[in-house]
Every structure is written in structure tokens, then in C-alpha cells.
């Protein structure tokens, strides 16, 4: 019997439960979305990464990635259309922790990345300026930047079209 490959997941969700408003939890059917199914949606739909690249990031075949993505989309659609709660839990995954955040120095235009789980840098590593900004439009998808946050773990504001200090 073939042993299931653990999928690599970059960012764990901050919220793990979603339910329709104004419907008591006791009246709701709950759909379980695994962490790796959520990661497939995040990579393909939110970050708009090609499926073959997303499969490589998760350490699985394209077919397995496609199957996970289809299952996840079906579960989310079922919950939204039929008013069900979504619980994100379980799965067979390894936290790879490769979520990155890009920063841009306003003084020297130096661009660099930091891991998501590290403290926000205080100054530019190249020139030492404190005029640094979280760079928007970093491949995380338009909706992601419009929401204004890079990710739940980092919690830093993104700079999209308008220049906002972080």
C-alpha cells in the first residue's frame, strides 16, 4: 500500500471557523475543509499561481493538487450556496513556513523579503533608512492587497496603489 505524501503548507489560517450570520450554530451543518485543501485554494485562486508551480510548492503531483483543489472548491461552494458552516482542520501536512513579505525602501528603492513569522524590519538593510513600506502587488493577487493585509501571521498593512506608511 502506498503511503500518502504529506503536503507542504506555507501559511496556516488565522481563523479556522466560518458560519453564516444570524443562523445559530446548532442549526448548521458543518463542512470540514482540510488545511491542505485551503492551501490549494490559497495558491491557485488567491495568489493566482499556476497549478504545476503550486503543486511543486506543496510537494505533490499536479493530479493530486488538482484533486485537492476541486474538492476544496466544491466544499466552499456547497457551504456558500447552502448556508453551511466551514471548519478548517485536520489533514496530513507539514508546515513549510515559507510565506514571505516584501518591503521597499523609499530612500534607495531597495527591495527585500523577510519570512512571514519574523518581526517587521525597522530600517533598510542597504542604506539604514527608516522610510520603509510593505510592498503591495507582490503576486498575492489583487483581492489580497485590496483587503489591506499581507497575511494573518504577519498582520502588516500592504501598500497597494496609494503609498501608505507601515
From Swiss-Prot:
InterPro entries: UPF0251 (IPR002852), WH-like_DNA-bd_sf (IPR036388)
PANTHER family named among the record's database cross-references: PTHR37478, UPF0251 PROTEIN TK0562
Family affiliation: Belongs to the UPF0251 family.
Protein name: UPF0251 protein UNCMA_27150
Gene3D superfamilies, per the entry: Winged helix-like DNA-binding domain superfamily/Winged helix DNA-binding domain
Disulfide bridge positions per record: none
A UniProt-annotated Pfam family: DUF134
Amino acid at each position: 500500500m502506498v503511503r500518502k505524501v504529506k503536503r507542504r503548507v506555507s501559511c496556516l489560517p488565522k481563523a479556522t471557523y466560518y458560519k453564516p450570520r444570524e443562523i445559530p450554530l446548532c442549526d448548521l451543518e458543518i463542512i470540514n475543509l482540510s488545511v491542505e485543501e485551503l492551501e490549494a485554494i490559497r495558491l491557485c485562486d488567491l495568489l493566482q499561481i499556476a497549478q504545476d508551480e503550486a503543486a511543486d510548492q506543496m510537494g505533490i503531483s499536479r493530479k493530486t493538487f488538482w484533486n485537492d483543489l476541486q474538492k476544496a472548491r466544491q466544499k466552499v461552494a456547497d457551504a456558500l450556496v447552502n448556508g453551511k458552516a466551514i471548519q478548517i482542520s485536520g489533514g496530513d501536512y507539514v508546515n513549510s513556513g515559507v510565506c514571505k513579505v516584501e518591503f521597499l525602501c523609499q530612500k534607495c528603492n531597495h527591495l527585500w523579503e523577510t519570512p512571514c513569522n519574523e518581526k517587521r524590519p525597522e530600517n533598510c538593510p542597504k542604506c539604514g533608512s527608516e522610510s520603509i513600506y510593505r510592498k503591495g502587488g507582490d503576486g498575492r493577487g489583487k483581492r489580497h492587497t485590496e483587503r489591506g493585509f499581507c497575511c494573518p501571521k504577519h498582520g502588516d498593512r500592504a501598500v497597494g496603489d496609494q503609498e501608505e506608511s507601515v
